[in-house]
Amino acid sequence: IPQPRGTPIRAIADGTVIGIFENDGNRKGIEIALRHTPEQTGLPFWTYSQYTHLSEMPALAIGDAVRMGAEIGKTGNSGKMGRNIRRDALHFAVLFSAAPSWSNDGRVFVPADGFFMDPIAFYRQEGPYVSAELAELPSSEKAVPVAYLKTDGTPVPAGAKRIWPYPCK
């Protein structure tokens, strides 16, 4: 998600910090990962959000609780891409699992029995959530309204539990 360097990145839901990685010398660059309970997201499983290419190490620690919309890092361009040059951007990923357990070996976090989730599925109000099933939906069912915070911190719609990682006007 392209954004100017230093743009604050927001937690997409209430959660807990489970990983902060410098990732010196790899493609992801500076990274933070959060775990979200089913109660925090309103989804029927545990979700894990991953944010990479941050411009600096986050001012958070593993185990910190974060609120939806809290700043968790700043947009940057950290990470190695060989000879390719890219602009400042957030690489944003969501994983999910029926299990609450995960591991962190100091280089990567891994949800137990976890799977990558199409971010579109994360913002759906009901299933399907599995990417292959989502792909089978007719085009008319693939458009998903995404909740967000206004620049003043007001969630749209009110009561949203999952938001876009950047505020909107």
Give the location of each predicted region.
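Terminal peptide-recognition signature
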Residues: 1, 15, 69, 92, ...
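Zn2+-dependent peptidoglycan hydrolase active-site motif and core
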Residues: 11-56, 85-91
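Acidic, glycine-rich catalytic/binding loops that coordinate metals and/or anionic ligands
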Residues: 64, 85-169
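Active-site loop architecture of trypsin-fold serine endopeptidases
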Residues: 75-89
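Glycine- and acidic-residue-rich phosphate-binding/metal-coordinating active-site segment common to enzymes
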Residues: 37-40, 48-52, 62-73, 88, ...
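Residue-level recognition of beta-strand microenvironments
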Residues: 20-21, 54, 75-78, 97
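Short alpha-helix capping/helix-loop boundary micro-motifs
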Residues: 2-4, 51, 56-60
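Short, well-structured beta-strand-loop connectors
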Residues: 8-19, 59-75
